[in-house]
Amino acid sequence: MHNIKKIRNDVEAFKKALNKRFIEIDVDKILSLDENNRDYIQQRELLEKEKKDISKSKDQSLFEKSKKITVEIDNISKLQAGVKNELETILSSIPNIPHPDVPTGKDENSNVEISKSGTIPNFKFKPKSHYELGENLNMLDFDLATKTTGSRFVFVKDKLAMLERALSNFMLDTHVNTNGYEEISPPLIATDATMYGTGQLPKFDNDQFELKLDDSSDRKFLIPTAEVILTNIVKDQIIDKKKLPMRMVASTPCFRKEAGSYGKDTKGMIRQHQFYKVEMVSIVEIDKCLPELDRMTDCATKILDLLKLPYRKIVLCTGDMGFSAEKTFDIEVWLPSEDKYREISSCSSCGSFQARRMKARYKNEKKETVLVGTLNGSGLAVGRTLVAILENYQQEDGSILVPEALKPYMNNIEKIVKI
């Protein structure tokens, strides 16, 4: 959500920022609605003052005038509410303003590689895809999932199910014991107000799994990411500055329709309607966002370092960032079967964008009430990490070596073989 006062005070800066996002917004309409809204408020305040003055008078002849003023106040209030609603609807559909140091570009082709780490495996055989490996092991069953549930689902079985669970536990243990995050086991259902707070609504309504519940008039959704529920923990709060930074982590199933992904990654586990993800969320003082983003990204890459998986870090350009982000680092892991890097984590600073929607604040050194900064990042996507292990640790006979870091979570087995 955007600060209308800031827009009003520097219209050209706002327009330039939107241009960097490559979106078209009628800023003049926003300013016109804002002016009308303020005019109605001023008219109402003048009428309320006049009514108050009349109430102090003992002149009974003014009684009828007071009644007319009450009607006028009601009419103006309705007009003002309509204008305010239209203004907020437009503002809530506009993405966050990019941080000045984010590279300008229209799409992923303008993203900038920051670094690479790890050694890309040099196989003496043609590497198989994760879904070929999993099906040959009899541990990934996409056909059965299609039969029971539909496309973009999978049954993960036996040792691969164990590996998936091991990954989640390993990631949580690392983030809690080494990186200083507090583990949370949150609800998996969010209200529309909660989804609005982090920016999923109203913009991405069509990509959410909505629940139809007879016992409530509120709309409710399966969470697309734990970011939604964790970030909203501070909704409508004034937080004690001493509690900042707040760092939280959760491992949850996530649910997405993938509405804009028709025809993409139709095979395998890369893009599914249901998947597990370990999510990190930080709530910080507003001027600490970018240092916290660097820290969070390092926490995510540490997992890949421990698993000895090759990856690269990129900074997203203005046109490729998510709706709520002011700056984003993506971490991409190497997939041998595709001969390229694929996203496994996205870490974003949202500045005060989500906080303004949630009314999440704290008292600064001057005792002023100001908006917090919010950040979120995958640490990591569990299914995609499973994919990366299958492909990078595969052997010529189709077996999969277990990474050293995961052996304590896997009863110290060395290798996953066909059942």
Swiss-Prot record:
Keywords: Aminoacyl-tRNA synthetase, ATP-binding, Cytoplasm, Ligase, Nucleotide-binding, Protein biosynthesis. Gene3D superfamilies: Bira Bifunctional Protein, Domain 2, Serine-tRNA synthetase, tRNA binding domain. It catalyses: tRNA(Ser) + L-serine + ATP = L-seryl-tRNA(Ser) + AMP + diphosphate + H(+); tRNA(Sec) + L-serine + ATP = L-seryl-tRNA(Sec) + AMP + diphosphate + H(+). SUPFAM superfamilies: Class II aaRS and biotin synthetases (SSF55681), tRNA-binding arm (SSF46589). Catalyzes the attachment of serine to tRNA(Ser). Is also able to aminoacylate tRNA(Sec) with serine, to form the misacylated tRNA L-seryl-tRNA(Sec), which will be further converted into selenocysteinyl-tRNA(Sec). Consists of two distinct domains, a catalytic core and a N-terminal extension that is involved in tRNA binding. This is Serine--tRNA ligase. It comes from Pelagibacter ubique (strain HTCC1062). The lineage of its organism: Bacteria, Pseudomonadati, Pseudomonadota, Alphaproteobacteria, Candidatus Pelagibacterales.
